[in-house]
Amino acid sequence: MTSDAAPELLLSIESTCDETAAAVIRRDGTVLGQCIATQETLHEQFGGVVPEIAARAHLERILPVINTALKQADVCGEDLTAIAVADRPGLAGSLLVGVVAAKTLALAWSKPLIALNHLHAHLYACQLIDGAPENIYPAIGLIVSGGHTSLYVCHTAIELEYLGGTIDDAAGEAFDKVAAMLSLPFPGGVEVAKLASEGNDKAYSFPRSMIHDPGDDFSFSGLKTAVRYAIAGPGRQDFSTLEISDQVKRDVCASFEAAVVDVLVSKCRRAIKRHKNRNKSNANEANRLIVGGGVAANQRLRRDLQAAADQDGFELWIAPPHLCTDNAVMGAIAWKKFEAEQFASLDLDITPGLQRGF
């Protein structure tokens, strides 16, 4: 007997930083429509995201992006089951645009509202990989992005235990700042990785800060300073007139990237081993690493994590590159909150910032 019931549909909205995105997602995970408006050209001349410019761009683009996703899915607001939006963490102005839009549509269409943690959604993107187990949890989770570098125990998709994070710069932020020192185009992380693939990763002996620290915190500011000293000496602030050979750029990028990846891999291995020791009765379940965030697209990181997984015998699931950067498809995590009846009120406020513990 077949059912004529209409499919359950979720509208997911993302505006935490400089991408305006929306997606229409069925309960089974099928993406019926999605749209992303990027802002790279708006921020390129500044070498980084300018919060006010980002917020204004979101304001201009949010409704066209939502309408495009709905049109692709061939649905209207009344067809939706729920509306989800990332309300934390991120840039205040950017978050506000998405949250206000979601609350307005939820009110207008009489749909339940679901608030999402942007970082938890990044990790959930691993669940969307073809071949991933139906339930990828529990696992150790690594978020590595421009604003955050954090480790978690992920008991379920929506129950995460924060283990530790960066005490200064995030890994992605360090990539962007090194790119700026070398006068590379924005966004810098991709450019650094490109040059790194052609360089000698042993040309410079950069520090691996906190790599031997038994805790789960990270630090990349010292590495950033070491790169500055290597290419310009102490005290220099203006790098625009500094002449650096192409080979030096390649070697600096390769040595820098190796230092970042070594720390990330080492911390993940240690966290997994500790988690396994705490859960010896369920060792197989505790023996899994999931990775999300923009820097998770880095090929050296993916390669070295896979090598560690093969050597240590743990499962590795990394979000596909197109879901590492900010997007609304990872908002499919909202279905887990829907099932748990974790709905937000129309008084929902934003929680911006880069605070530890998210």
List each language-model region with its residue ranges.
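A contiguous, well-structured pocket-lining segment that forms one wall/lid of small-molecule binding clefts
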Residues: 194-289, 298-312, 342, 358
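N-terminal beta-alpha supersecondary unit
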Residues: 6-79, 85-89, 118, 122
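Glycine-rich beta-strand-to-loop/alpha-helix junction loops that act as flexible
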Residues: 85-88, 105, 145, 289-298
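Glycine-rich phosphate-binding/hydrolytic loop that grips phosphoryl groups
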Residues: 122-124, 319-357
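A short helix-loop
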Residues: 2-9, 15-16, 23, 33-34, ...
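Glycine-rich phosphate-binding loop and adjoining helix at the ATP-binding site
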Residues: 79-131
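Conserved phosphate-binding/catalytic loops in two-lobed NTP-binding clefts
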Residues: 115-116, 288, 305-331
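Conserved phosphate-binding catalytic cores of ATP/NTP-utilizing and phosphoryl-transfer enzymes
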Residues: 2-8, 116-140, 334
